[in-house]
Amino acid sequence: MNFEIEQILTQIIAFLIMLGVLKKFVWKRLLNLIEERKQLIQSEFDKIENQKEEVTKLSEEYKAKLHDIDAEARRRIQEAVVKGRDIAHDIEQETRQKVTSLLNNAQEEMKLELAQAKEQLKKDVINISFAITEKLIHEKVDISKHQKLVEEAVEQVEIR
């Protein structure tokens, strides 16, 4: 390997001249471009960080809203259940009152019909008694006739 000193010195001088020219004309622009790029990247990172914070904040707000909505839904369901129970209780009370009223009416009607039947039975017994007495007065009473009249009277009561 033959290295020539002139060639090495020429290349060192050329490198230093090139470095001087680059420093004078390009180095400041290059540093400015690097700084601008650094600031742009930093601003993008800041934007990303802000967006992350905003997303986190919105996420927490949505979670809080969902919690509130769930609580409201549970409250409304509970109100509906209570209202349904109240309505069921009212219907049950109303039905009990109607049943009691119908039962009382039926009992009153039965009492009335029983009273009418008793009254009719009294009238029938009186009529039969009059009929028996009338026959007894018109005819001479003997035991067999008396027995026959009673049987006829009972048959008349059964027919009616």
Curated annotation (Swiss-Prot):
KW Signal (keyword) present: no
Gene Ontology MF terms: proton-transporting ATP synthase activity, rotational mechanism; proton-transporting ATPase activity, rotational mechanism
Principal location: membrane
GO cellular component: plasma membrane; proton-transporting ATP synthase complex
Keyword Nucleotide-binding assigned: no
Topology versus the membrane: Single-pass membrane protein
Highest taxon listed in the record's lineage: Bacteria
Matching InterPro entries: ATP_synth_b/b'su_bac/chlpt, ATP_synth_F0_bsu_bac, ATP_synthase_B_chain
Residue stretches spanning the membrane: 5-27
Record's subcellular location: Cell inner membrane
Keyword list, A-Z: ATP synthesis, Cell inner membrane, Cell membrane, CF(0), Hydrogen ion transport, Ion transport, Membrane, Transmembrane, Transmembrane helix, Transport
Its biological purpose: F(1)F(0) ATP synthase produces ATP from ADP in the presence of a proton or sodium gradient. F-type ATPases consist of two structural domains, F(1) containing the extramembraneous catalytic core and F(0) containing the membrane proton channel, linked together by a central stalk and a peripheral stalk. During catalysis, ATP synthesis in the catalytic domain of F(1) is coupled via a rotary mechanism of the central stalk subunits to proton translocation. Component of the F(0) channel, it forms part of the peripheral stalk, linking F(1) to F(0).
Subunit text: F-type ATPases have 2 components, F(1) - the catalytic core - and F(0) - the membrane proton channel. F(1) has five subunits: alpha(3), beta(3), gamma(1), delta(1), epsilon(1). F(0) has three main subunits: a(1), b(2) and c(10-14). The alpha and beta chains form an alternating ring which encloses part of the gamma chain. F(1) is attached to F(0) by a central stalk formed by the gamma and epsilon chains, while a peripheral stalk is formed by the delta and b chains.
Family: Belongs to the ATPase B chain family.
Protein name, entry field: ATP synthase subunit b
